[in-house]
C-alpha cells in the first residue's frame, strides 16, 4: 500500500475546504463524552483495502481472531482503496464514524486536525512496551500526544535487476553516485540484450498526484544530508533551500535532464505505472516497499532481481519509514473495546495474522512488536534487508500538524524542476521554502 495523499495543486483549495467542513462536522463527535458507552455494542472496523483481496482476507482473519479471544463482536469493512477518503468524509458529515480505522501513518495529521480521532495513553496500552519506539513516533502528533496504536511498519529499499547488473559487469552501488552510474549502464548498455534502446536505469513515480515524487525522493534527500524542515525550539523552519537539500534536488534534476536515466514519462508516472515498468523488463532500479515482492516474484521472477539497501549519501544512510496505525475514532460508544482491538492488533498474535504468510494478504510488512520475527515467519531473507533498513536507517516524515500538505507542496516543487530542465534549482527551492514558511505559519508550527 502506498501513501495516501491529497490532490495536486489544482485541488488543494477544494481539499482545504473539505477539511474545514469535515472539522465542523466532526465537532459533534470529537468529545469523549459525546457518546453514551455500551460495552456490548459491536465494533465497526474499517481498513483501506479492496473487498475480496488477500489483504482484506487477512484483516477479516484478524477481526475474527480478536472476537474469538475477547468475546467482543467486531465487523470488518474493507473500504475500497480509491474511495476510502470519500466514504470516511461522508461518515464524518453524518457524525457516525466507524469505531476503528486502520490507515496510513501519514494520515495522522489530517485525522487529528479534523478532530476525528481520540488520544491514546501510550503507557496505558497493554503490551505497549513491546512496540518499537520508531513505530510509536509515527503515532505521535505535533503536540507530543499519541493518537493511535501502531500496527504495521515498512521501509523502502532498492529492487535491482540482478541479471542486468551481471550483464554490464557492475558491482553493488556503495553511494548514490555509484547508483546513478549503474542506472546509466542500465540505460545505455542494452542490459536485456535485445539490441534496442528500450531500457531505463531508474524507475521513478514522478507525478505530483498524491505526492508520489516526494515519497520517492525523501530517501535520497535525507541520504544526501538535506531535509524538508528543521526543528527549532518548539517549531520548525524550512530547510529545503539549504545547500545540502539544493544539492540533492540538483542530482534529482540531473537524473531526468542530464544522464536521462529515468523511464519515459517519469514526471507524470504514478506507482501503478512504475510497477508495470519494472515488472515488464523496461526498468532496472526501483525504490519501493517489501509489499511488492510477491507480485514481482510472480511476474518478473525471483531470480531476476535482488533487494539492496539504498546506499549512503553525503549525509549517511537514511530511508523513508512508513506504516499503518490503528486509529481509535472519536465518538465511539465502546471505547474500552476500541482499545482492546488496537492492543490485540499490535500483539504477537495479531501481528502474525497480519503477516499474511498463509494467504499472501500482507497487512503487516514489518512487525511493530519486538516479539515477532517477520523474516523467520516468512522464511525469506530478503525481508531482513527491509527490516535492517527500518531498524538502522528508517526515518519518519517530519512531525508536523499536517505533513500531507507539505508532501503535496514539495512534490509540486520537485516536479517543476524535473519537468522543466531549464528551471533554476536554487531559485525553485527558495520559492518552495517560502511556501513551506507560509504553510508552517498556517499550521501554527513556525519556530519563533
Segments and roles (model prediction):
Residues 91, 98-99, 128-164, 175, ...:
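A structural signal for short loop-to-beta-strand junctions that line the ligand-binding cleft
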Residues 143, 147-151, 156, 180-237, ...:
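Extracytoplasmic/periplasmic solute-binding protein
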Residues 2, 73, 166, 392-448:
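Conserved C-terminal helix/tail region of periplasmic/extracytoplasmic solute-binding proteins
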Residues 290-302, 313-412, 446-448:
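C-terminal lobe and pocket-closing loops
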Residues 118-133, 192-211, 224-247, 297-300, ...:
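Short, solvent-exposed loop/beta-turn-alpha elements that line the ligand-binding surface or hinge
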Residues 105-157, 198, 213-216, 220, ...:
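Hinge/lid segment of periplasmic solute-binding proteins
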Residues 183, 234-266:
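Glycine-centered hinge/linker elements that transmit conformational signals in sensory
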Residues 2-110, 122-129, 267, 314, ...:
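Conserved N-terminal structural module of periplasmic/extracytoplasmic solute-binding proteins
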Amino acid at each position: 500500500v502506498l501513501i495516501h495523499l491529497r490532490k495536486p495543486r489544482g485541488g488543494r483549495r477544494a481539499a482545504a475546504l473539505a477539511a474545514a467542513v469535515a472539522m465542523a462536522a466532526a465537532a459533534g463527535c470529537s468529545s469523549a463524552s459525546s457518546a453514551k458507552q455500551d460495552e456490548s455494542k459491536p465494533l465497526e472496523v474499517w481498513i483501506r483495502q479492496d473487498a475480496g483481496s488477500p489483504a482484506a482476507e487477512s484483516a477479516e482473519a484478524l477481526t475474527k481472531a480478536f472476537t474469538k479471544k475477547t468475546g467482543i463482536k467486531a465487523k470488518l469493512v474493507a473500504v475500497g482503496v480509491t474511495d476510502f477518503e470519500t466514504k470516511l468524509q461522508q461518515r464524518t458529515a453524518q457524525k457516525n464514524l466507524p469505531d476503528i480505522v486502520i490507515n496510513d501513518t501519514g494520515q495522522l495529521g489530517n485525522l487529528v486536525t479534523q478532530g476525528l480521532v481520540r488520544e491514546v495513553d501510550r503507557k496505558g496500552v497493554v503490551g505497549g512496551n513491546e512496540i518499537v519506539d520508531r513505530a510509536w513516533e509515527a503515532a505521535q502528533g505535533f503536540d507530543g500526544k499519541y493518537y493511535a496504536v501502531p500496527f504495521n511498519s515498512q521501509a523502502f529499499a532498492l529492487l535491482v535487476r540482478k541479471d542486468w547488473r551481471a550483464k554490464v559487469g557492475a558491482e553493488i552501488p556503495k553511494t548514490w553516485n555509484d547508483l546513478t552510474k549503474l542506472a546509466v549502464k542500465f540505460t545505455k548498455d542494452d542490459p536485456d540484450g535485445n539490441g534496442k534502446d528500450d531500457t531505463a536505469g531508474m524507475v521513478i513515480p514522478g507525478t505530483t498526484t498524491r505526492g508520489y515524487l516526494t515519497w520517492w525522493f525523501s530517501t535520497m534527500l535525507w541520504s544526501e544530508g538535506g531535509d524538508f524542515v528543521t526543528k527549532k525550539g518548539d517549531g520548525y523552519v524550512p530547510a529545503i533551500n539549504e545547500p545540502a537539500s539544493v544539492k540533492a534536488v540538483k542530482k534529482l534534476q540531473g537524473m531526468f535532464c542530464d544522464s536521462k536515466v529515468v523511464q519515459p514519462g517519469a514526471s507524470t508516472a504514478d506507482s501503478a505505472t512504475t510497477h508495470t515498468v519494472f515488472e515488464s523488463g523496461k526498468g532496472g532500479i526501483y525504490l519501493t516497499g517489501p509489499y511488492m515482492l510477491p507480485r514481482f516474484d510472480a511476474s518478473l521472477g525471483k531470480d531476476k532481481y535482488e533487494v539492496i539497501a539504498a546506499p549512503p549519501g553525503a549525509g549517511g544512510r537514511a530511508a523513508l519509514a512508513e506504516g499503518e496505525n490503528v486509529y481509535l475514532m472519536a465518538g465511539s460508544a465502546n471505547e474500552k473495546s476500541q482499545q482492546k482491538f488496537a492492543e490485540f492488533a499490535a500483539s504477537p498474535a495479531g501481528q502474525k495474522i497480519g503477516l499474511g504468510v498463509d494467504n499472501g494478504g500482507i497487512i503487516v510488512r514489518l512487525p511493530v512488536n519486538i516479539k515477532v520475527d517477520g523474516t523467520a515467519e516468512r522464511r525469506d531473507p530478503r525481508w531482513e534487508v527491509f527490516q535492517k533498513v527500518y531498524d538502522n536507517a528508517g526515518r519518519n516524515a517530519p512531525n508536523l500538524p499536517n505533513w500531507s500538505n507539505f508532501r503535496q507542496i514539495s512534490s509540486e516543487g520537485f516536479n517543476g524542476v524535473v519537468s522543466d530542465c531549464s528551471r533554476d534549482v536554487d531559485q525553485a527551492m527558495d520559492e518552495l521554502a517560502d511556501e513551506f514558511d507560509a504553510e508552517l505559519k498556517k499550521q501554527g508550527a513556525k519556530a519563533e
